[in-house]
């Protein structure tokens, strides 16, 4: 009996010690975060909470529609494509289906809107929806896209302003390989393997031409892309490594072209020669959008798939100033 009591006391003390160690580690990591990500931590502002982040949703795409209305694209654990509409802090889920009524699959890496047109970047295609229909739909509504457009990139993310939509691809060696014709080494010696293609939009927000006006050569690990005037912004991340928010001034003309379905398209690039600033951020950054003079960014680290972000309160969309 005495042995059992001693064993119980030992285990209790051991448990207390382990909890104390874990608490100290957690506090230490929080403190380190303030130092490692000092610029980000000092200038970031919370925007809104990611929908269903603790209920299986893995957020990827992000779009600010107006005021407190946002669109989110992503997937659930079984790779089921998911779409959320968030208005004034209240979210509803729309379930994308194909023309047969079957659940669509994919990561839904980007989402953007122009007038009444909503575009989701998914598996080399743009899924086109009506914004007014999404806003009017009930929670849990199954909805097929109005149109599916094949594009020249892997369509990992997208961004639209009033006149153009940019559709880009994610690249990492040996894991997410893409068309070798998208490779380009810039004059500064930067080796690129991915493209962001710019398509014209009609006045009503629809795609005016299925051939891009031009393509932009970019580095790998790009999860999100946004443009404000002549400032181009990339969200880059992979795994538990720190994410980066990268700012570039203007586009550089390569003087070359890239082949898109037999059509020669002008090739521009973003590289170290027009890079202005890099902001270090916590891991798992995803899509971007522009709201006023700030860029907003979503993170997937707090979802149930990765968990780690739950320890650091990473369930929010964050904004950072464009300077």
Name each model feature, range by range:
Residues 50-55, 95-103, 147-151, 213-219, ...:
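Surface loop/turn motifs at the tips and blade-to-blade linkers of beta-strand repeat domains
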């Amino acid at each position: 009996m005495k042995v059992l009591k001693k064993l119980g006391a030992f285990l209790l003390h051991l448990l207390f010690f382990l909890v104390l160690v874990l608490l100290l580690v957690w506090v230490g990591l929080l403190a380190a975060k303030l130092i490692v990500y000092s610029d980000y931590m000092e200038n970031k502002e919370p925007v809104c909470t990611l929908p269903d982040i603790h209920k299986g949703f893995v957020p990827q795409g992000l779009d600010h529609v107006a005021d407190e209305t946002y669109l989110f694209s992503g997937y659930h654990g079984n790779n089921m494509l998911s779409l959320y509409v968030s208005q004034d802090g209240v979210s509803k889920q729309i379930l994308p289906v194909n023309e047969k009524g079957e659940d669509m699959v994919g990561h839904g890496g980007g989402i953007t809107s122009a007038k009444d047109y909503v575009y989701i970047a998914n598996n080399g295609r743009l899924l086109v929806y009506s914004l007014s229909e999404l806003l009017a739909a009930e929670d849990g509504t199954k909805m097929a896209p109005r149109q599916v457009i094949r594009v020249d990139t892997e369509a990992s993310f997208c961004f639209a302003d009033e006149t153009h939509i940019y559709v880009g691809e994610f690249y990492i060696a040996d894991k997410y390989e893409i068309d070798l014709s998208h490779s380009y080494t810039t004059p500064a010696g930067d080796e690129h393997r991915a493209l962001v293609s710019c398509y014209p939009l009609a006045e009503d927000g629809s795609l005016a031409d299925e051939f891009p006006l031009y393509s932009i050569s970019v580095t790998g690990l790009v999860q999100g892309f946004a443009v404000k005037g002549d400032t181009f912004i990339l969200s880059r991340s992979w795994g538990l490594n720190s994410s980066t928010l990268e700012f570039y001034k203007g586009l550089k003309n390569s003087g070359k072209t890239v082949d898109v379905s037999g059509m020669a398209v002008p090739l521009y690039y973003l590289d170290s020669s027009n890079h202005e600033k890099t902001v270090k951020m916590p891991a798992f950054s995803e899509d971007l959008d522009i709201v006023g003079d700030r860029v907003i960014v979503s993170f997937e680290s707090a979802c149930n798939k990765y968990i780690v972000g739950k320890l650091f309160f990473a369930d929010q969309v964050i904004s950072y100033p464009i300077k």
